């Protein structure tokens, strides 16, 4: 409580938190605004019938969008195009030496260029996905007439309802760009990572429906092991606690590398070198691999699902990449491991750490300074990252498997374990760290101001 009072007693931090919550509230408003020409109630009824209790791609997309996907609202695409664009840009940096050189020579200018590239790719991907979404809506309208209002279908060009296509594409692109802008504003002027907070908000919005699914399915008096009874509920709660604890362990765990400091002469005094440690995080990438892997699998599977009626091989791809399938689980695990290594390789700088240690007279016992220290850090980080990546993949995939065994609804297994819980817990921990860091800086700033002699600026 003391920390909470301290948080809200600082005007700047209070403004940042208020700014963040205000923009997140703006995102939630978009969930209830349907695309012009779409009957949201009929769309939700169709999706509920389509999804049922089985694990389905659309179920995952709906959870990530906070219910906007099933209602066919203006932000139905969510931030998936932005995340996919970020993956493409990060891969381009790895495979294009010119971008790498620009990032080294002028980091600020390089970041601005990558930001522009990410926005451009986001626009292109949002355009493609919104076109597919419009096509899928028309296909749904054939099954359940009235999902698309007749007025939107009256104007046609070469048999194509161009007004509906144009309206859907423009509105959904605008919704995606709005979410992208909100995410960037939160990251720059608020607290936490904006895009991650938007995803977390969407996941948390499904919590009431998850509780409803559990209570509707729960049969306390049943002795049939195939039904969801008290034993299944206890197992589900145990899985939830395990995922919660494992997520915290993965994100907070670290390998401490002992570091010694050489004796130094400061003025006329000889300062005796002391000992400290260099923390290497078990999972340096946090929940970024989970978000990237989920979004990357969702993109081709969405295309396959939207166009499955027109091609048998696309239908097979959509079925193969449906959440809960063996192929989906294998690809998901491999992508999590890949993105864990990929993100660590792009963010962890062993050569810079080794250089700073040599400059400050610090060394790892038994390891020479310079290149040997860099090699040792790379080797150690690779081993630690392997452990973290495998652990992260197991935690992400295990609850979905147990969910199928316990015969619970897909939204329950998604929320109480695996992907959703990893993202929610990881983002909350990251946001809390940012708040703690802000409080620490203000505390030191306050001490410096207090100890500053009068008359000095």
Curated annotation (Swiss-Prot):
For this protein, the record's InterPro entries field holds: SecY (IPR026593), SecY/SEC61-alpha (IPR002208), SecY_CS (IPR030659), SecY_dom_sf (IPR023201)
Enumerate the Pfam families for this protein. Answer: SecY
Single biological process term from Gene Ontology: SRP-dependent cotranslational protein targeting to membrane, translocation
Q: Which SUPFAM superfamilies match?
A: Preprotein translocase SecY subunit
- Segments crossing the lipid bilayer: 17-37, 75-95, 118-138, 162-182, 195-215, 230-250, 287-307, 326-346, 386-406, 412-432
SS bond partners: none
Q: How does it sit in the membrane?
A: Multi-pass membrane protein
Q: What does this protein do?
A: The central subunit of the protein translocation channel SecYEG. Consists of two halves formed by TMs 1-5 and 6-10. These two domains form a lateral gate at the front which open onto the bilayer between TMs 2 and 7, and are clamped together by SecE at the back. The channel is closed by both a pore ring composed of hydrophobic SecY resides and a short helix (helix 2A) on the extracellular side of the membrane which forms a plug. The plug probably moves laterally to allow the channel to open. The ring and the pore may move independently.
Protein family according to the UniProt entry? Belongs to the SecY/SEC61-alpha family.
| Name of this protein | Protein translocase subunit SecY
Question: Which species is listed as the source?
Answer: Chlamydia trachomatis serovar D (strain ATCC VR-885 / DSM 19411 / UW-3/Cx)
